């Protein structure tokens, strides 16, 4: 393949030319003689670089080919397996998690654990550093799982006071039928709205001379008995 020819302006330059001239800014004056000298130096340097580039291309083309470390089939098979298992755009639903000990993708410059706080990344290749960092990180995780965790009291010598026991719930035993309105039979309880004891009756007390019944307390307050069944009403 023939290389493209480099454009070279022919000497002498047209009188009155005021365009860019290489190396002219390094000269003290901008006369026509200095302009011709600058163009001549530029043409020689350009031709020399062009010859060196062609010589390099020839040496690369004639160099002996190196033997591959792995066959092309092995490389393609490995890439296909990696693509099938770990590619993020795969549409299959897999529960396979990428292991930590696998080296990252070439060119990946993400976070590596234990890379900046240890000497594992000194004077090694990136893949070797990544493998060592992940291995050390996994070892730390395994040791942390197997270590015996001491309680807080043993480490700092603090005696923890047990929480107070929960009091048992109060069970109120009532005999007979219970009304559906709030329970006013708790002694000593007060109503937050009326600001008086719940057992206190604002009406004047009614007393009678009849003999005491179970529904009448010794304090003289009269309480109605619950209604009995239909048989009692008929009788």
From Swiss-Prot:
InterPro entries referenced in this protein's UniProt entry, alphabetically: SPMIP5, SPMIP5_dom
Presence of keyword Cytoplasm: yes
Alphabetized UniProt keyword annotations: Cell projection, Cilium, Cytoplasm, Cytoskeleton, Flagellum, Nucleus
GO terms for cellular component: cytoplasm; cytoskeleton; motile cilium; nucleus
Pfam families according to UniProt: SPMIP5
Keyword hit for Repeat: no
Signal peptide (residue range): none
Protein localization: Cytoplasm, Cytoskeleton, Flagellum axoneme; Cytoplasm; Nucleus
Tissue specificity comment: Expressed in sperm.
Superkingdom of the organism of origin: Eukaryota
Function: Microtubule inner protein (MIP) part of the dynein-decorated doublet microtubules (DMTs) in flagellum axoneme. May serve to reinforce and thus stabilize the microtubule structure in the sperm flagella.
Subunit structure: Microtubule inner protein component of sperm flagellar doublet microtubules.
PANTHER family: CHROMOSOME 10 OPEN READING FRAME 82, HYPOTHETICAL PROTEIN LOC681006
Name of the protein this chain belongs to: Sperm-associated microtubule inner protein 5
Organism: Bos taurus
């Amino acid at each position: 393949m023939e290389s493209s020819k480099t454009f070279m302006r022919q000497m002498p330059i047209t009188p009155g030319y005021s365009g860019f001239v290489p190396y002219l800014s390094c000269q003290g004056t901008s006369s026509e003689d200095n302009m011709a000298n600058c163009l001549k130096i530029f043409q020689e340097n350009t031709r020399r670089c062009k010859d060196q580039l062609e010589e390099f291309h020839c040496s690369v083309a004639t160099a002996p080919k190196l033997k591959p470390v792995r066959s092309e089939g092995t490389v393609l098979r490995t890439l296909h397996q990696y693509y099938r298992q770990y590619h993020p755009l795969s549409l299959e639903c897999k529960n396979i998690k990428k292991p930590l000990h696998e080296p990252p993708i070439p060119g990946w410059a993400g976070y590596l654990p234990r890379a900046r706080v240890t000497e594992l990344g000194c004077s090694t290749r990136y893949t070797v550093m990544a493998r060592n960092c992940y291995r050390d990180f996994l070892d730390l995780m395994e040791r942390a799982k197997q270590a015996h965790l001491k309680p807080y009291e043993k480490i700092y010598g603090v005696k923890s006071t047990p929480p107070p026991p929960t009091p048992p719930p109060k069970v109120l035993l009532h005999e007979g039928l219970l009304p559906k309105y709030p329970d006013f039979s708790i002694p000593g309880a007060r109503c937050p709205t009326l600001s008086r004891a719940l057992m206190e009756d604002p009406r004047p007390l009614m007393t009678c001379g009849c003999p005491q019944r179970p529904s009448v307390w010794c304090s003289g307050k009269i309480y109605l008995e619950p209604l009995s069944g239909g048989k009692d009403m008929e009788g």
